[in-house]
Every structure is written in structure tokens, then in C-alpha cells.
């Protein structure tokens, strides 16, 4: 009799893209057989998980992953930079947040004992998995994206992020293989990790749409 694998899904809580991708992947994983799934996030995404899986609440865990501080039109660069070492708008310094969340996440790693972890946006989980010799998959469509000269000061941060992503056992790119890659401008993999990279296509809903009566636009274009 096959033992159930324990699979952890770590979903970065900033925006809905990470959640949407992981839920599509989760559907496919559940088609492969009975396994024990655990979900990790915070805030609105954590609540969405509770609403989506009411019978699995014991396997849904809130982890306070650090996120950028919001501004009027997306993340506030100035506030996020200040927050690296200083408290801003009720947020502890980022270095404190990272240390605290990795400790909490590490305790859950030790308690659950994963066979596989899948991380969409949560780079810290890559580090924890590597230390414990657990297979980890990192889902992304960005790796060392090219920068305009006016944004070159972001380069050290991108190098740090790339280093953490590289700790995954495999890097799953949510895009088509070259030369049909849509986000190629954002993908600049170094030679030393090319063997880890797998293009898995777009995480889209493949449900068929029933063909109904032609709409006004279709009738117009057919004329």
C-alpha cells in the first residue's frame, strides 16, 4: 500500500497571481492520487484558503511572510527601503520579520516532515528545504530581470533574490519554452542553474467553452 506523501504549498501573499497559479497546480496534484496537502500564507490569501478548503482547515497554516509596504499605486519603494532596518506603519524592521518568519516556518517543517514542498514566491522556504534535504520546487516567471539604467540600484536586491531562488531543487517557469516564451525579458538564468529550469507552460484554466449563438461583434465581422 502506497504511503501518502506530505506536500507543502507555500504561497506568497502579495497579490493574487501566486494564489491563482498554485490553485491550478493543486487541482492537478490532487488528480495524481491521495496525498496530504498543507497550505501556507497570510492575510487575504490565508482567508481564501480557509474558504476554499473548509474541510482541510487543520492543514492551512498562517505564516507571516514579509511583504512590501503598499503605496497608492503598488509597493512604496521609499517606505519599503526604510522598513529594511526601521519600523514603518506598524511593520517591524524587515530583518526582524525575516528572522521571525523563518523560525516559525522552520518549526512547521520539523513538525510536519514534508516529502515535497512547492514554493510560489516564498524564497525562504527554499532555504529551509535545502537545509533539510527536502525536494523543493519554485514556481516563477522572473529571474534577474533586466533593469533600466535608472533602476540599476535594484541590482544587489535582484542578485540576492536569484541566490535564494537557486536553492530550489527545480525551478518551474510558468511560461512556454523558448522561442515562445512571453516573459523572456524577465528570465536571465545563469549557466550554473540551467539544468534546474523546467518550462511548464501557463497555469491557465483549460475548461472548454461551449459555442453558443454568435454575438453582435461576430456577426459584424462575418459581414
Predicted stretch roles:
Residues 47-48, 117-132:
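An aromatic- and histidine-rich active-site surface loop
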Amino acid at each position: 500500500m502506497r504511503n501518502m506523501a506530505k506536500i507543502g504549498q507555500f504561497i506568497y501573499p502579495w497579490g493574487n497571481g501566486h494564489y491563482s497559479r498554485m490553485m491550478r497546480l493543486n487541482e492537478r496534484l490532487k488528480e495524481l492520487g491521495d496525498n496530504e496537502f498543507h497550505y501556507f500564507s497570510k492575510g487575504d490569501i490565508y482567508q481564501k484558503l480557509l474558504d476554499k478548503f473548509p474541510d482541510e482547515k487543520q492543514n492551512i497554516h498562517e505564516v507571516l511572510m514579509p511583504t512590501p509596504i503598499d503605496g497608492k499605486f503598488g509597493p512604496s519603494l521609499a517606505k519599503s527601503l526604510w522598513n529594511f532596518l526601521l519600523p514603518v506603519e506598524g511593520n517591524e524592521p524587515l530583518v526582524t520579520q525575516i528572522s521571525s518568519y523563518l523560525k516559525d516556518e522552520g518549526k512547521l517543517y520539523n513538525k510536519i516532515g514534508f516529502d515535497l514542498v512547492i514554493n510560489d514566491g516564498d524564497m525562504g522556504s527554499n532555504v529551509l528545504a535545502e537545509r533539510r534535504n527536502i525536494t523543493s520546487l519554485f514556481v516563477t516567471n522572473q529571474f534577474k530581470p533586466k533593469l533600466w539604467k535608472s533602476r540599476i540600484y535594484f541590482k544587489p536586491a535582484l542578485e540576492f533574490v536569484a541566490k535564494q531562488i537557486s536553492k530550489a531543487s527545480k525551478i518551474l517557469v510558468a511560461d512556454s519554452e523558448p522561442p515562445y516564451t512571453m516573459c523572456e525579458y524577465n528570465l536571465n538564468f545563469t549557466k550554473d542553474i540551467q539544468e534546474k529550469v523546467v518550462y511548464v507552460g501557463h497555469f491557465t484554466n483549460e475548461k472548454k467553452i461551449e459555442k453558443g449563438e454568435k454575438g453582435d461583434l461576430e456577426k459584424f465581422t462575418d459581414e
